Amino acid sequence: MKQLIQIRCKNNKKSLKVEAGTTLSDIFKQLNLTLPYPPVCAKVNNKVEGLHYRVYNAKDIEYLDISSPSGLRAYTRTLFFVLCKAVQDLYPGTTVRIDIPVSNGFYCDLNIGRPVTEADATAVRNGMQTIINRAIPIRRHEVPTDEAIARFEEMGYHDKALLLRTTGRLYTLYYDINGFVDYYYGSMLTNTAQLTLFGLEKYYDGLLLRIPSMSNPSELGALIRQDKMFEIFQEHHRWQNLLGMSTVGTFNEAVREGYATEIINVSEALQEKKIAHIAENIAGKKTVKMVLIAGPSSSGKTTSCKRLSIQLLCNGIRPVPVSLDDYFVDRELTPKDENGDYDFESLHALNLPLLNKQLMQLFNGEEVELPKYDFIKGRSVPSGKKMRMRAGDVLVIEGIHALNPELTSQIPEEYKYRVYASALTTILLDDHNYIPTTDNRLLRRIIRDYKQRGCSARDTIRRWPSVRRGENKWIFPFQENADEMFNTAMIYELAAIKTQAEPLLEQVPENCDEYAEAYRLRKFLSYFLPIDHGVLPPTSLLREFIGGSSFSY
């Protein structure tokens, strides 16, 4: 007799009895459910699974399409898989590294023994489209890890073999498209025909894989040149080559061999060298009267600002901090968002006329009384603090809007030096699996919110989408305005914060929506061997989040 199990669908709040062992894909057909876009994965008891997944016990299921973050990740991973197969079909024995998110896509380094041409981009794009048009099933396999390692070694995927060796897992999942196998962290689509939209073109010395926009999945994300951002990525690769590691497997191997302290020391020294370089550039521009530092949430811009101030002093420049928090308009004048709530992240929550007026007065040698914002009363009050700039002074202004031209629209451009600080790139899981740098920032924020504000990981994860929307509106559009970009991520970072982040993530209960994200973060942290964060220097940028900094915040 066939065993029936009960499924509760969160999309339509209905229950359904199905045979044990039915796939999520087949359950969706039985539900007769309609989503804005076709389903690409599902939350099963608040854990994201691919539609291959078979259900053997009663479950709560929520189907996800490409307009969700988890859905877009599954779609993108499957595009990576098809790209890698197309490259192997066209250039057997060569490799492709899916490297960095840039220009609303992903930069792919195609190693074919010669410069990549427009013809190569066209050939790979056509090869991908052929695979998609053939509607090839994507099969999921679970095998002993030593068997998977042997398979990947035979294929020349030494980065994957090394990663799997260092995880200590008994079994490993991998996928295949018509005999071409690969390993991916996270759920995948079930058929190549589900990939209805992508773009591929030559970009610098490699390829740019373009993906659908999450806000409008029927269109590709806008192609925006990010030349300064790309140069930072290239610089980071040079640092990785110096350290001899670019993937988690090589990092874990170095940690096992006792090089953790050396990795930390070199990473910190390289970062300090970059900060010193920025300070020297500022000192070389005699017209600069203010340094503007911007970055998204948990980017480490506060510590970056403090360390840059020290380097400015070393160059004979006195940094004078100016807090944008004191320039908020009175609360009743604060703009409201689409929900009718005060939008404190809006540029227009700041008193821009007063800010520009006082800046010009300072630059003209006048004395001004700086404002003081009373956050309890919600209005500006007299501070009694007066300021006059002296020879050798440079104002240092840190805030999310610092790169927005409208913030200092009345200030001559030659007076300004703009710095964008963010966790831009760190390390790859392997050549086909990147780690989103937003995950670095989210983990930093989870730890800091718990330590400094008493917030749970669940609360931080719940608020994160709202934070990201604000960043997309007020920060990222202006990042290319920077005179300098500073990558605040470090190659050892995730291994150092792992021991603090994991216990907080484990406290997120399975019966809440935030569990899926907490589980995903725990899963990718599990790939890293932990390192002792006690050896981090007191000026380390990570200390802003994990504690023990010699700076005051």
How would you label these PLM feature ranges?
Residues 314-332:
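Short beta-strand-centered segment that lines the nucleotide-binding/catalytic pocket of NTP-utilizing
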Residues 320, 333-376:
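Conserved nucleotide-sensing/catalytic segment adjacent to the nucleotide-binding pocket
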